[in-house]
Amino acid sequence: MPKRQDIETILVIGSGPIIIGQAAEFDYAGTQACLALKEEGYRVILVNSNPATIMTDNEIADKVYIEPLTHDFIARIIRKEQPDALLPTLGGQTGLNMAIQLHDSGELEANNVKLLGTELESIQQAEDRELFRTLMNDLGVPVPESDIVNTVEQAFAFKEEVGYPLIVRPAFTMGGTGGGICHNDAEFKEIVTNGLHYSPATQCLIEKSIAGFKEIEYEVMRDKNDNAIVVCNMENIDPVGIHTGDSIVVAPSQTLSDVEYQMLRDVSLKVIRALGIEGGCNVQLALDPHSLDYYIIEVNPRVSRSSALASKATGYPIAKLAAKIAIGLTLDEMLNPITETSYAAFEPTLDYVISKIPRFPFDKFEKGERVLGTQMKATGEVMAIGRTYEESLLKAIRSLEYGVHHLGLPNGETFDLGYIKERIQDQDDERLFFIGEAIRRGTTLEEIHEMTKIDYFFLNKFQHIIDIEHDLKSNKGDIDYLKFAKNYGFSDRVIAHRFDMTEEEVYDLRQQNGIIPVYKMVDTCAAEFESATPYYYGTYEYENESVVTEKEKILVLGSGPIRIGQGVEFDYATVHAVWAIQQAGYEAIIVNNNPETVSTDFSISDKLYFEPLTEEDVMNIIDLEQPKGVVVQFGGQTAINLADKLAKHDVKILGTSLEDLNRAEDRKEFEALLHTIDVPQPNGKTATSPQEALENARSIGYPVVVRPSYVLGGRAMEIVNSDAELEDYMNQAVKASPDHPVLVDRYLTGKEIEVDAISDGETVIIPGIMEHIERAGVHSGDSIAVYPPQTLKQEEMTTLEDFTIRLAKGLNIVGLINIQFVIAHDGVYVLEVNPRSSRTVPFLSKITNIQMAQLAMRAIIGDKLVDLGYQPGIQPYTEGVFVKAPVFSFNKLKNVDITLGPEMKSTGEVMGKDATMEKALFKGLTASGMEVKDHGTVLMTVSDKDKDEIVSIAQRLNEVGYRILATQGTARKLAENNIPSEVVGKIGGEDDLLTRIQNGEVQIVVNTMTKGKEFERDGFQIRRASVENGVPCLTSLDTVVALTRVIESMTFTMKNM
């Protein structure tokens, strides 16, 4: 069937900011889809609120709108652009929900916009729990015993019939938001209430729990001629009951018999045909391990996290082909881009095993609720490819960057067996490692199976890994056994530990005996057809399929899994660096292990190695490819931390030299440099023991900021106000990096400024300066950043420019540098310098139209900025005001305190742009998920130190018609200043403030309680209650002032005469 001729312009809705449950996989899918539609000759208009993505680059679509993803804003774009069609299935749940709202409001019909791909009725049939259940019953496909409810009372009526355990699944939500497993009335009431709140349709499915069944997924494609194929089937190692995004997944499935495989395949295809899906679709099934009984759990009628994984696991580009199916092409007329000889209608076959392991944020949120259930908690994931299951699992484990390299925890031997078993029963994020520890102690597989319901196939593989580990000890230095262990994915580091050698000695031993990996191609067809992809994985076999070319090569290190502090911004920079390398005529090679991102799309680089980012795995690739050099400054801290390890092997680090990278990180050397170039920094000292830290803090004077050196995203960084708080910190956090000392700095309150600059060693250019709304002390990744600065004086701007140039030249920067300054009452101070790409690079690149990562890469290759047409210093300003606002995923993480401080907590970001600061802020706040209303009720409860400042804010909010609720102390302060407020009861009393929040009476919460380390503190409960009830809670008064400005600009003030 030829493609549709009745449409010319297509609107694509992106997925917005990165949150838990909706991460970089949609940047990858959306980028692929937009390019596929352009390739077919359509005009593409993209709307997405996330500036950190490749998808929102001007090259990806004909017109890019970075605007809030709300009904009103998208409707404005539709009215302005008059697209012929809308493609809703590539923007995750956000894109789908938007399409449904635009359809229901009549906006699409009024503007003659057709929906492409899967019909809306089909989407609703798959997403609406009631309609889906009815269809399954008609098809004779079993679904778990369940009921659809719209109220808590209905839920309890169903519970009386079937009893616990029950699973609650809210309709039209993403990543299991608001859902969970319930074992008693209290849990049930809380989860159902939450679920109804988070579901846009106020609807939940309550189903009898089938936890313990195997969870199997089929990634399927169908076109309008009813051709349907299975791209990939995957098996969750964790049984049903843990969200698939939080499960360890293996592809292809390992434990299904042929009968089971075919039965579930047939069901998957039958269901997507009945639904009329056109494009990609994910089917989740539950299989009874003891019989052929199965249930269908759910169907995602869109591109999903699993389809990104399936694309990378097979090399089959699902999103690209789904976009082409949406415009009328069929599977039997599209070529598979990997082989370029076979058609897309051929099902991929794999001759390797892939493992996916989720990356959790609990290294940042140590007090977070770690137990896994039906609500997703992982921020990202890693994938690894091997020829055996053991190899792919161990490669995935060492890709996670938890400091864990093996099936066990670093301090595993210190735990007693009782504790280990308790942790296994908890089913939390560390369960896999505790299972390894239990096997080491001789716990039987039967007992572990009883506790976890994990299939014996996998438990036997874990046992095999522990057996090899054990035998390494008794075969110290044995070359054959070394080879055997390498076949099963053991790293040099783990072997070295068992052989009583250093990692270098094992590396040398391998080199001398020719035990080196070969690289195999991922070709979608198990080598049945000729294939032309440059997509490889390493394994210890005989034939190397990665042909080394004569061309000069540059190797770029990617940034690994998405986590808090290291998001998609670094993938963005990686991709741009690769494009610049190719333009300069070099061969670009990427090493990365994140299946969700654009950088691991095989069509981006000349060669992609899907491997762990460790010294050993990267060196193996360098030994084969012999690149001219390696680029580390685009891959975040992951890549920077590998620089010195690679340099030990005489690998050339391109761009800023290793000595200079270390000079920026090493406290003493950095202080010496600042002294030489005459740039001031807050008074600070270095401590190697708790005693020394106390002496330092007393001599500097409280408050002080304490942190370990060499960290990203402010990990383990805190502001402390007293000896007691400091002692508490030193006892908990110094472990954060034992070989590195702790820095103790004077905490300066003032405006925080962030600058990104590019240097070629001679000329320094500054694309832009950003001012933070929150004063220093809030991590730059969690602050609202504004471009251009709104409150800086000209002489401050000149000083910032001057200091930036001095720092870039003083550190001999070649490439990018990111600097944070604070402007205190007595001048400008430098807070920190990062000699690498930062998380603001995409944001500034989009605003200024200076492709910073590409320009930095050209400087690294040796081009001069002056020859490229740039003048030194601050570049000309772009018209308008641009705001970068953080986005948090607190509603997915229980027990996490949302107070902003020096430790980063946001998972993503959005951009708001308009002619004025207020309008840009309104867009930024709206895009971040905050509903900004021009009237309503604000609850204020602030600490003593903030009481003076809250008065003027309350005055302004009162004048635009906001009602004020306040706790006793705050209300007293307001009354002294003639500002009316209603006093609310303390927690636990009658009509207390938590009840007010839960009943939906409050639109904004302002809370700056003194920080108590213990959870029981009222402030913590207030903050959590607001998150769990979807009420914006602001913990920094600077953010409140910004919000007040926006509210004032939307409305009129009412003052009496």
From Swiss-Prot:
Residues holding Mg(2+) 3: 820, 832
Coiled-coil regions listed in the entry: none
EC number: 6.3.4.16, 6.3.5.5
Pfam families: CPSase_L_D2 (PF02786), CPSase_L_D3 (PF02787), MGS (PF02142)
Binding-site residues, Mg(2+) 4: 832, 834
GO BP terms in the entry: 'de novo' UMP biosynthetic process; glutamine metabolic process; L-arginine biosynthetic process
Residues where Mn(2+) 4 binds: 832, 834
Region (Carboxyphosphate synthetic domain): 1-401
Cofactor(s) needed by this chain: Mg(2+); Mn(2+)
Region listing for Oligomerization domain, in residue ranges: 402-546
ATP-grasp domain mapped to chain residues: 133-327, 671-861
Keyword Lyase: no
Disulfide bonds: none
Residues noted as binding Mn(2+) 3 in the record, renumbered to the chain: 820, 832
Catalytic activity: hydrogencarbonate + L-glutamine + 2 ATP + H2O = carbamoyl phosphate + L-glutamate + 2 ADP + phosphate + 2 H(+)
GO cellular component, one term: cytoplasm
NCBIfam families: CPSaseII_lrg, PRK05294.1, PRK12815.1
Complex formation: Composed of two chains; the small (or glutamine) chain promotes the hydrolysis of glutamine to ammonia, which is used by the large (or ammonia) chain to synthesize carbamoyl phosphate. Tetramer of heterodimers (alpha,beta)4.
The record's note on its domains: The large subunit is composed of 2 ATP-grasp domains that are involved in binding the 2 ATP molecules needed for carbamoyl phosphate synthesis. The N-terminal ATP-grasp domain (referred to as the carboxyphosphate synthetic component) catalyzes the ATP-dependent phosphorylation of hydrogencarbonate to carboxyphosphate and the subsequent nucleophilic attack by ammonia to form a carbamate intermediate.
Protein name: Carbamoyl phosphate synthase large chain
Designated gene of the protein: carB
